[in-house]
């Protein structure tokens, strides 16, 4: 347990459900734990007792990835006799997916077909999932290569990215998605069993992530937050820039989003997607804000002495060994922190002739937010907007042309 974890309260101690078995937290709330084929080796799913159209059953929060191990765990749950830690013979009445990442939505189509249940999801998550679940095209592969080159990996990349290995590709972990869904929206109240759950959306980790907050049942105050990936007890949520949205500002969006959760009651039981249920939401939010502030300071210091690519920052921000899969996320997160300072006007962005994008500190008098100084980017100085020229325009680096923005 790291020092920050000691500031949180884990009411269940070290108890964990076995894969494919239900662990009851309340009469109406149960915990499932499914395997993942990564260093982060599990995901938590949640079963909520429900009634829909006079039918008794479950509402499922997230599904697990489409892997043989997870499908086997679901088979075990469905076949378990009543009272043996399975579904007790009750159907899934609906699925609510917090967001579109494969470990959260990968088996939605299989479960929808098995139980005839609807998928509930925010429209931003559903739409992006439909795009990413398609087999990659030649155009997308070219886009990905260009993005990897911009990170500093070279073309072809000099280092393998396990996140892009075929067996871990998005469309393999999400082989299908239900053709229709029911949209959920920020602030909406969803009645599940004897509880009302308020939808609280956020971004930075994904486009329109939905957390669910209940103040309690009709019988008692019992605040619970199903936080998804927005607040995790042991690790920080990935806030990465990806090739599909290369101009994003995920770190700032994420920090704004988690502060919205401070309206939850102080003794809220947090049910995260990874790690153990905990109490101490407000303390954990403060820890995460401090963590990102420290990382931004490290980026400032690195860029004060030289122009840095995302790859340059990985050993500075991540001091532990990374496997190939983790490297992909680390690169995206390094770029996310660079973008935060670039959007704040603290860094200048430089496009080098080798395709690598680097960032360096601006002088105080030249610190202009990119929205004001960069209406668009051009490959030649003649098309650069006046604001961009005033802020530095184009520089020569090592004898080669470099664009600044």
Predicted regions mapped to residue ranges:
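Intrinsically disordered, low-complexity terminal tails and inter-domain linkers enriched
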Residues: 52-54, 153-160, 216-221, 363-403
């Amino acid at each position: 347990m790291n020092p920050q974890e000691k500031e949180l309260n884990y009411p269940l101690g070290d108890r964990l459900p076995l894969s494919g078995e239900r662990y009851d937290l309340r009469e109406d709330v149960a915990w499932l734990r499914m395997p993942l084929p990564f260093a982060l080796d599990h995901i938590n799913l949640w079963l909520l007792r429900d009634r829909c159209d006079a039918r008794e059953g479950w509402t499922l929060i997230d599904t697990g990835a489409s892997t043989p191990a997870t499908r086997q765990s679901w088979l075990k749950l469905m076949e378990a006799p009543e009272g043996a830690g399975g579904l007790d013979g009750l159907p899934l009445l609906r699925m609510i997916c917090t967001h579109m990442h494969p470990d959260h939505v990968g088996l939605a189509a299989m479960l929808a077909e098995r139980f005839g249940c609807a998928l509930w999801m925010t429209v931003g998550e559903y739409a992006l999932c439909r795009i990413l679940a398609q087999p990659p095209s030649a155009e997308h592969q070219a886009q990905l290569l260009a993005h990897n080159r911009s990170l500093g990996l070279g073309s072809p990349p000099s280092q393998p990215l396990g996140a892009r290995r075929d067996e871990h590709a998005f469309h393999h972990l999400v082989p299908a998605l239900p053709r229709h869904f029911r949209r959920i929206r920020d602030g909406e109240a969803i009645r599940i069993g004897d509880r009302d759950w308020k939808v609280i959306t956020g971004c930075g980790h994904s486009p329109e992530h939905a957390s669910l907050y209940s103040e309690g049942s009709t019988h008692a105050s019992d605040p619970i937050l199903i936080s998804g990936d927005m607040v995790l007890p042991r690790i920080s949520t990935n806030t990465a820039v990806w090739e599909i949205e290369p101009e994003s500002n995920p770190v700032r969006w994420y920090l704004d989003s988690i502060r919205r959760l401070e309206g939850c009651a102080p003794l809220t039981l947090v049910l995260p997607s990874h790690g153990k249920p905990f109490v101490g939401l407000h303390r954990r939010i403060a820890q995460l804000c401090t963590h990102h502030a420290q990382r931004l300071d490290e980026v400032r210091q690195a860029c004060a002495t030289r122009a840095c690519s995302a790859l340059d920052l990985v050993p500075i921000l991540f001091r532990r060994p990374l496997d190939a899969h983790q490297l992909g996320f680390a690169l995206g997160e390094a770029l996310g922190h660079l973008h935060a300072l670039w959007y704040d006007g603290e860094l200048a962005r430089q496009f080098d002739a080798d395709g690598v994008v680097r960032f360096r500190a601006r002088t105080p008098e030249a610190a202009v937010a990119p929205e004001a100084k960069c209406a668009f980017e051009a490959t030649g100085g003649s098309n650069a907007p006046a604001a961009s020229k005033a802020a530095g325009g184009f520089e020569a680096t090592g004898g080669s042309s470099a664009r600044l923005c």
